């Protein structure tokens, strides 16, 4: 794993909804990316207080497990849109237990199939969320906040090279998309 791709306190990220996964995959292959992993199953467990105080502050606390790669992460996002920190952990179950001991509870679980590639300094993910859709995320992490505007432009240029348009841009987080889907599905269930 190229760990330098995932270091930093800030993350510039653009998410695109894919209408043609094969066309995107072909465009990505033409850039000769380095493959980190393909078709891993990720399970993201979101934790918050019973009062949802983290969500109210624009923060997310996530324990992520990835199989078959075996990667386990503790992730904190927010409150700023570009703020994201992650650290490798060795026991996701123990970390979740510790959070519950501290009064947090799991408020959402998201499963996705993810492939991660590197194109120069950028990481490109191809994600599938059952019932939600297919997405590409283009991102870079840094500790230097002054670089964020330049990285935004470079990622938009990369998106163009990958055949992605601003019409495909998805500004909602996977958490929001899943919560909205759950709300819609619960409204469809007859009482």
UniProtKB/Swiss-Prot annotation:
Inhibited by GTP. Belongs to the adenylyl cyclase CyaB family. GO terms for cellular component: cytoplasm. Disruption phenotype: Cells lacking this gene show no impair of cAMP biosynthesis. Its EC number is 4.6.1.1. It is found in: Cytoplasm. This is Adenylate cyclase CyaB. GO terms for biological process: cAMP biosynthetic process. CDD domains: CYTH-like_AC_IV-like (cd07890). Keywords: ATP-binding, cAMP biosynthesis, Cytoplasm, Lyase, Nucleotide-binding. It is an enzyme of class 4 (lyase). Residues 9-180 form the CYTH domain. Optimum pH is 9.5. It catalyses: ATP = 3',5'-cyclic AMP + diphosphate. Optimum temperature is 65 degrees Celsius. GO terms for molecular function: adenylate cyclase activity; ATP binding. In vitro, CyaB catalyzes the biosynthesis of cyclic AMP (cAMP) from ATP. It seems that under the physiological conditions CyaB has no function in cAMP processes. In vitro, it is also able to hydrolyze substrates such as thiamine triphosphate (ThTP) and inorganic triphosphate (PPPi) at a low rate. It has a slight preference for ThTP over ATP and PPPi in the presence of manganese ions. This PPPase activity is probably not of physiological importance. The active site is at residue 46. The keyword Cytoplasm applies.
């Amino acid at each position: 794993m190229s760990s330098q791709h995932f270091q930093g306190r800030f993350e510039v990220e653009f998410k695109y909804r894919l209408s043609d996964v094969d066309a995107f995959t072909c465009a990505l292959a033409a850039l000769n990316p380095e493959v980190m992993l393909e078709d891993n199953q990720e399970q993201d467990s979101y934790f918050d207080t019973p009062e949802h105080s983290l969500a109210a502050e624009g923060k997310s606390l996530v324990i992520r497990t990835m199989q078959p790669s075996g990667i386990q992460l503790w992730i904190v996002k927010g409150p700023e849109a570009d703020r994201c920190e992650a650290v490798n952990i060795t026991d996701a179950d123990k970390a979740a237990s510790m959070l519950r001991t501290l009064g947090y509870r799991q408020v959402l679980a998201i499963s996705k199939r993810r492939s991660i590639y590197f194109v120069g300094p950028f990481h490109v993910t191809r994600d599938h969320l059952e019932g939600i859709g297919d997405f590409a995320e283009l991102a870079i992490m840094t500790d230097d906040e002054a670089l964020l505007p330049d990285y935004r432009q470079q990622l938009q240029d990369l998106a163009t090279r990958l055949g992605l348009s601003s019409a495909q841009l998805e500004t909602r987080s996977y958490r929001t998309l899943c919560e909205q889907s759950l709300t819609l599905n619960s409204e469809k269930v007859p009482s």
